[in-house]
Amino acid sequence: MRKQSKIIFYAGIVLGFAAVLTGVALSGGRKIPKDFTVSYEGIKTADITAGVSVHDPSVIEVDGTYYIFGSHMSGASSEDLRNWTSIGDGYTSSNPIFDDLLGTEHVFDYTGSRDSVIPTDDGTYHVWAPDVVYNRAQDLYYMYFCTSSTWNASNLCYAVSDKPEGPYTWKGALIYSGFTKDTIEATDVLDYVDIDYAKKNYIMAGNKYNYEKYPNAIDPTVFYDADGKMWMVYGSWSGGIFLLEIDEKTGLVIHPKEDEKNGVDPYFGKRLLGGGHKSIEGPYILYDEESGYYYLFVSYGSLTSCLLYTSPSPRDRG
């Protein structure tokens, strides 16, 4: 029996996963649906052998070599996407992916370790969900990742290397979440909004972080748009998925002007979707040059669930 399905792009390694993806093509100014139907007839499943284990994977290809990075300071490389060689793994100072991340000052000041302002809930290190992107302006590789302590207290960070495999040197923190009136001074939030705005919007009654409206600062991915601008999409559960522009010359986020009507916060950026602490996480935005559309992928619900949104602009949900 001949089986057909629609292809979906997944930001990582695709292992026998199929779903529905609807695209568009432009012809004479009209948008014509693109059919991604393919046949899997004759395709066999490869043997699975013991290899590397990478959670929350992000893959980048450089000169024919694929590099995969994941949570817990793990990474590997491959030339065929089947046979992988470990680069590093685990929370050790000698992990070659980083330039002694555990021994670098200020990395875990706010979250991510038992000694942080907000300690990890299990007393161990939490370094999660890295995404590596080549910065065209600087000819450097940037790794965006997060340290996290609880289900909403997290910190987006970045590190830099001149080689895709590393070592990556930590450069600084970008976005903080999960703060209260007692911990906001340990963040950079008040560099961008005043204390009255922060108390009104970010902190709920009972001195709790307003997690239903604002994000958990984890799961970052970075991409270039059609005009060459860099963007970072991030978020998990909590207030949903958010978008911030990246300054290509520095690798830092650009905090926008407040635009409440269009869901733009001066610190966290543009909320794309989600909120109310509903299931949604792991955002990834793919720009398709042929259609001129951006595809936003997120995971939600159970292990097998996935959502797809399309838009002609990276700042809007289609």
Please report, for each region that a protein language model flagged, where it lies by residue.
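Short consensus segments that form the blades of beta-propeller domains
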Residues: T120-G123, S148-W151, N210-E212, G301-S305
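Short loop/turn segments that connect beta-strands within beta-propeller blades
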Residues: E79-R82, K163-P164, D247-K249
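Hydrophobic core segments of beta-strands in well-ordered, beta-rich domains
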Residues: H55-M73, V127-W151, W170-K171, D219-L243, ...
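Eukaryote-specific detector of the first structured module of a protein
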Residues: Y67-I68, S78, S86
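Conserved small/polar residues in nucleotide/adenosyl-binding loops
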Residues: Y309-D316
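Conserved blade-register residue in beta-propeller folds
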Residues: G75-S77, Y158-V160, L243-E245
